């Protein structure tokens, strides 16, 4: 359970130290806890109960459900052999990188290409996050139990988009392991652009070409979670104003038919409904806020029918999840812990600053507000098995933890609330 996409683990394994020594590393998938647990098992500090040999085929099926993309499972993934595109490119490949203006430059090495493109390493800005979707002037707050405004949120997947191609061949990448929380797609505009660039440059130079984005390129080009303004009445009905995003109205109306939905045009980065649980999770959080807290905390049902309960208190995050036949408890638990970490960060700290021109200006992985290992509370997961069809469970956990974290914070009117 200490590895999902496998991008961060090689560097972490080199340390095998406590959470404070993970400050130089970032993991977006696991929420840190399962990495620490795996280290404790390796050191002999924790002894796992004996069991039959693990079914890695079933584990990969569960991982594909949770990551919503092909997912490789096995010890080799944690050691850096998960098959990321840039790791398996031919060693004699040229390197292509974009300039800020979008022109492509080619070099023998990444440094050569970046020098030719005159790229400047991205930095964290001093700007605060903003809330571009606002309530209309005539909006009557008094008729609603809770209101909430959110901002742009970076998916923050760790592997920057990369594609390589041989002359007259087919491009490889960018999505080979892990779902990137919906931030990557084989058919997205960005993926198609990178594939076409790799193919064109490989044919032009008659050499294999690696097309590689730096972190700042990813932030500028990849889609974000769209900002919203939401209001819920005590009976669970409500209204939502959303940054115009293809498919978002349909997702919300299917999940909450009685809600009124208003699309707003805002200047800002591209947004996508593919980002984890976009649209329905926001509404689920609002509806949970006016429902009595259950014995196990805030309760959320995903559009697929997965059920999750979550409570956030001083002792940590406590979760129950039911999502059909488990297939592999290690993988499911790992994804649910990662979803809890992400849901907590969504409420407390995650967001990116955007300038007056609508361009992202927080351009480093650390500037997105992802909760650090040392600041991550203990997360307990109870899995309820049944013989129903296996469905994604971690997205329901993501929404339930966000609902519980919002309740624990006293329902502040903006997220992130501790930035």
Indicate where each model-derived feature is located.
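Zn2+-dependent cytidine deaminase-like catalytic core
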Residues: 1-22
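Cofactor-binding beta-sheet edge motifs in enzyme active sites
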Residues: 3-6, 25-419
């Amino acid at each position: 359970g200490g590895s999902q996409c496998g991008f961060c683990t090689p560097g972490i394994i080199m340390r095998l130290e406590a959470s404070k020594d993970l400050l130089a590393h970032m993991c977006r998938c696991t929420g840190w806890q399962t990495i620490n647990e795996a280290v404790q098992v390796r050191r002999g500090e924790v002894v796992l109960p004996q069991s039959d040999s693990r079914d890695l085929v079933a584990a990969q099926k569960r991982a594909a459900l949770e990551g919503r993309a092909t997912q490789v499972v096995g010890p080799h993934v944690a050691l850096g052999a998960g098959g990321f595109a840039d790791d398996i490119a031919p060693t004699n490949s040229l390197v292509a990188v974009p300039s800020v203006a979008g022109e492509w430059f080619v070099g023998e090495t990444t440094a050569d290409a970046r020098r030719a493109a005159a790229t400047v390493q991205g930095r964290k800005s001093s700007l605060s996050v903003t809330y571009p979707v606002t309530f209309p002037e005539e909006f009557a707050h008094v008729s609603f139990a809770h209101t909430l405004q959110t901002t742009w949120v970076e998916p923050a997947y760790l592997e920057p988009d990369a594609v390589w191609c041989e002359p007259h061949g087919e491009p490889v990448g960018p999505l080979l392991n892990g779902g990137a929380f919906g931030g990557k797609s084989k058919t997205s505009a960005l993926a198609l652009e990178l594939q076409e660039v790799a193919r064109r440059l490989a044919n032009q130079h008659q050499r294999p070409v690696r097309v590689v984005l730096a972190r700042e390129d990813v932030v500028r080009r990849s889609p974000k979670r769209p900002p919203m303004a939401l209001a819920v009445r005590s009976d669970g009905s409500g209204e939502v104003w959303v940054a115009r995003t293809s498919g978002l109205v349909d997702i919300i109306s299917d999940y909450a038919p009685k809600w009124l939905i208003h699309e707003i045009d805002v200047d800002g980065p591209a947004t996508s409904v593919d980002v984890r649980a976009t649209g329905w999770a926001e509404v689920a959080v609002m509806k949970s806020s006016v429902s009595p807290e259950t014995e196990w905390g805030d309760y959320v049902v995903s559009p697929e029918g997965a059920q999750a309960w979550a409570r956030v208190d001083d002792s940590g995050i406590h979760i129950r999840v039911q999502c059909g036949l488990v297939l592999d408890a290690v993988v499911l638990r790992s994804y649910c812990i990662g979803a809890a970490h992400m849901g907590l960060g969504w409420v407390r700290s995650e967001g990116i600053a955007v300038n007056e021109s609508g361009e992202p200006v927080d351009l480093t992985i650390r500037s997105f507000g992802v909760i650090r290992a040392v600041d991550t509370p203990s997360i307990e997961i109870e899995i309820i098995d049944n013989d129903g069809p296996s469905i994604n469970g971690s997205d329901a956990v993501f929404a339930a933890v966000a609902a519980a974290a919002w309740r624990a914070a006293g329902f502040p009117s903006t997220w992130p609330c501790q930035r």
